[in-house]
């Protein structure tokens, strides 16, 4: 598919204009990364509170929702502006509708949704986790699978609706009950990738600023 260079340039300029905030310049130095979550906490939405290091789950009737390091902190909406609070509300509701408990943790070692999800499934009592990047990309993962394998992947974040997030929660809960649900239906738009590619890259870079090498996941109290 040929992409008009002028259109692409305009998209990138629009994205950069949108993304101009009071953030400091991107730096991947360890000293900056280590202090970033604390600095961002003052800016973040108060609906998520860290309450200590996440522990290994003992209950098989739970699904862990593992969010990226900037989720609810420096970033509070996904790539198309859906608030993180609303996304979590729907995912949790979907899980609970299936009679399963939801537990939310924040992961710091990676901004890659696959590795965030793997940290979650290792702590999940059922072995099932949902990984969510700040930009909205989501995956359902199972303990024992390699990071780049998964039960269901939702890579086109711009096309994920709140109803889709709710269905993701329901399916994750069904996997926790050892059922074999039909995959969550999703929209497909070939233009979504070129339209949002620049913004997606910028959001990923911004989230990567909050990676803290070696920091263990933190349990989150969620106020919805």
UniProtKB/Swiss-Prot annotation:
It catalyses: propane-1,2-diol = propanal + H2O. GO terms for molecular function: cobalamin binding; lyase activity. Keywords: Bacterial microcompartment, Cobalamin, Cobalt, Lyase. Ethanogenic BMCs can be made in E.coli by targeting pyruvate decarboxylase (pdc) and alcohol dehydrogenase (adh) to them. PduP(1-18)-Pdc and PduD(1-18)-Adh strains targeted to the BMC (PduA, PduB, PduJ, PduK, PduN, PduU) make significantly more ethanol than strains where Pdc and Adh are not targeted to the BMC. Its cofactor is adenosylcob(III)alamin. Its main location: other. It is an enzyme of class 4 (lyase). It comes from the Bacteria. The keyword Lyase applies. One of its GO terms (biological process) is propanediol catabolic process. Pathway: Polyol metabolism; 1,2-propanediol degradation. It is found in: Bacterial microcompartment. Pfam families: Dehydratase_MU. The propanediol dehydratase enzyme is a heterotrimeric complex composed of a large (PduC), a medium (PduD) and a small (PduE) subunit. This is Propanediol dehydratase medium subunit. It comes from Citrobacter freundii. The gene is pduD.
């Amino acid at each position: 598919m040929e992409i008009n260079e002028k259109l692409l340039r305009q998209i990138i300029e629009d994205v950069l204009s949108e993304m101009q905030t009071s953030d400091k310049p991107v730096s991947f130095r360890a000293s900056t990364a280590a202090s970033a979550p604390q600095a961002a906490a003052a800016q973040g939405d108060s609906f998520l509170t860290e309450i200590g290091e996440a522990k290994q789950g003992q209950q098989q009737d739970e699904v862990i929702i593992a969010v990226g390091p900037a989720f609810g902190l420096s970033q509070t909406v996904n790539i198309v502006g859906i608030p993180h609070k609303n996304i979590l509300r729907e995912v949790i509701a979907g899980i609970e509708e299936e009679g399963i408990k939801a537990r939310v943790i924040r992961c710091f070692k990676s901004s890659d949704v696959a590795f965030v999800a793997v940290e979650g499934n290792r702590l999940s009592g059922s072995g099932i986790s949902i990984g969510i990047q700040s930009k909205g990309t989501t995956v359902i993962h199972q303990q024992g699978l390699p990071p780049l394998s998964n039960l269901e992947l939702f890579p086109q974040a711009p096309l994920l609706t709140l109803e889709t997030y709710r269905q993701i929660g329901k399916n994750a809960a069904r996997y926790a009950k050892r059922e074999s649900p039909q995959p969550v239906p999703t929209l497909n738009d070939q233009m979504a990738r070129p339209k949002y590619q620049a913004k997606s890259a910028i959001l990923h870079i911004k989230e990567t600023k909050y990676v803290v090498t070696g920091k263990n996941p933190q349990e989150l109290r969620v106020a919805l």
